[in-house]
Swiss-Prot record:
UniProt protein name: Phosphopentomutase
Gene name of the encoded protein: deoB
Chain residues that bind Mn(2+) 2: D298, H303, H351
GO molecular function: magnesium ion binding; manganese ion binding; phosphopentomutase activity
Recorded superkingdom: Bacteria
Catalytically driven reaction(s): 2-deoxy-alpha-D-ribose 1-phosphate = 2-deoxy-D-ribose 5-phosphate; alpha-D-ribose 1-phosphate = D-ribose 5-phosphate
Cofactor: Mn(2+)
Amino acid sequence: MSKFNRIHLVVLDSVGIGAAPDADKFFNAGVADTDSDTLGHISETAGLSVPNMAKIGLGNISRPIPLKTIPTEDNPTGYVTKLEEVSLGKDTMTGHWEIMGLNITEPFDTFWNGFPEEILTKIEEFSGRKIIREANKPYSGTAVIDDFGPRQMETGELIVYTSADPVLQIAAHEDIIPVEELYKICEYARSITLERPALLGRIIARPYVGEPGNFTRTANRHDYAVSPFQDTVLNKLADAGVPTYAVGKINDIFNGSGITNDMGHNKSNSHGIDTLIKTLQLPEFTKGFSFTNLVDFDANFGHRRDPEGYRDCLHEFDNRLPEIFANMKEDDLLLITADHGNDPTYAGTDHTREYIPLLAYSASFTGNGLIPQGHFADISATVAENFGVDTAMIGESFLGHLK
């Protein structure tokens, strides 16, 4: 019999809690990640008040320097720790795949200076369309169509760009390049980015509509991902008949592998929390696992190095935690964590190699305290033990510490 009938894992994308031991091997604009500290630096520079996470014990997590504006709790309502990554990458897919039990020894490729001519030329030859070279770099998805959408409408060129993650994205106006044509181009791009030196996690079709100054991305987005290289705990759960619910980009990250119910993409963190709450309320969801990603921290504020915006985004999530609690059952377990860091005060614009926090809460807890410090995959090992399935490659369960 399961200790918890339902477990809900919420990933606060990029909310790291201090430099990892191997941060000296990871860089931002030539600066090693050794002094990165997403939560710590936001707390120091912008002020951070997250009373609901603080009550669970966020301020009690072991750190060289305590979080400046987050108090410790003498009698927290949950259990906390921080977890270290073993995989050789600090991107979204690597973090999530490791959380679900995999050790990624060959990280995906990222292209901070844009894609090489060889790839661009192949796409041009296949599609019969030119690529706007000036867009070929890490770019905000909305900014890139604002900057190059008018030109595309005139010329029919492709907007090819990337991000901090191992992705190639192609944006096209639906009236200029039909969606089906865009999909065919993306399928081809997928076929040429399956091995080094261009091993990419996802190819994303990004259709948009509108007029210059008022472009809008449409729901016809399509992701061409790669599945995890072996079964994760999601697969073990699904194979055992345990329902799995994906909220946000989780389904894309795992290419649908091990996901039995995809609840759709998030328009924003707030929309993602709404979807999570709707998932919690589903009458048929009496047992199983939900997995939510909230990406605004990372996409809107981490990469843009905006500590005040990041702070406000954390406040927004914390303010809505009581709603999540109110929709949980007595025997539910909530796990709040991250997938990497993205210190908005740091050099460069890339992710940062950090520990991630872990907060565990259940109305059924009679105890509280610290969970032994471990690794990302301990989360999936705990989920696996709870539901009586095997772990994946790595991970040590902390289920026995939750009283």
